[in-house]
Amino acid sequence: MKKNFPFHMVTNSPWPIILSFSFMNTLISTVIWIYSSISMFMILNFINSILIMMLWFRDIIRESTFQGMHSMFITNFLKFSMILFILSELMFFISFFWTFFHSSISPNIEINMTWPPKNIKFFNPMEIPLLNSFILVSSGFTVTLSHYYLIINNLKLSKSYLLLTILLGIYFTILQTIEYSNSFFCFNDSIYGSIFFMATGFHGLHVLIGSIFLLISLYRMMNIHFSNMHNMNFELAIWYWHFVDVIWLFLYTFIYLLI
């Protein structure tokens, strides 16, 4: 850190370009899985991306916690960057909702101008979707409690509630997997099937990423990397998790409940 120079000059890192290629391979293998039902490459590339992210997080933890590179100035810019990232993710979901409303309010003649399309047996919103809603809302409450207990220096309860939040996120992912496996329609079944699996699947991916984000926070909390004054990583993870919660409420309302 140079004198009178508030920015952290990051050393050369291979992780951004490597992670970019790994994400590209993951997306390509996902398309292959959709068309050929071969999921092995997608799973391997996804695991590879997770491992690269862990290595990148390791470097960031070393720079912030042990080298003291993240000053208040840097911390504020990181928070602003997280806000921009969440807004960019919001644009993705706005595009999905736009497609959904465009197709449902003015159905195409190719689907007999009816919505939902005929022969589409959709899910009962009072079963797994409602349970998932309770799970995510509860997880938002537990992660807020975890942050509160961290602020008042009660690490034991903070870790307990954070672990409960992660378990709720994993439970949500398991239930969504069960829901997909029992679906009576697939991605190729009209515009409704495409929108449904794209929107809910993209949200499910965010839940998985958020769970990993919180798991890293739990690891750091167990290693006493956080204090009641310095817990930016955990705070950003909470922002992301609440964003995922709110998006699910909109998905449940419009795609499940008001269909």
From Swiss-Prot:
Record keywords, A-Z: Membrane, Mitochondrion, Mitochondrion inner membrane, Translocase, Transmembrane, Transmembrane helix
Family: Belongs to the cytochrome c oxidase subunit 3 family.
EC number of this enzyme: 7.1.1.9
Major localization class: mitochondrion
Organism for this UniProt entry: Apis mellifera ligustica
Compartment(s) where it occurs, according to its Swiss-Prot or TrEMBL record: Mitochondrion inner membrane
Protein name: Cytochrome c oxidase subunit 3
Reaction(s) the record says it catalyses: 4 Fe(II)-[cytochrome c] + O2 + 8 H(+)(in) = 4 Fe(III)-[cytochrome c] + 2 H2O + 4 H(+)(out)
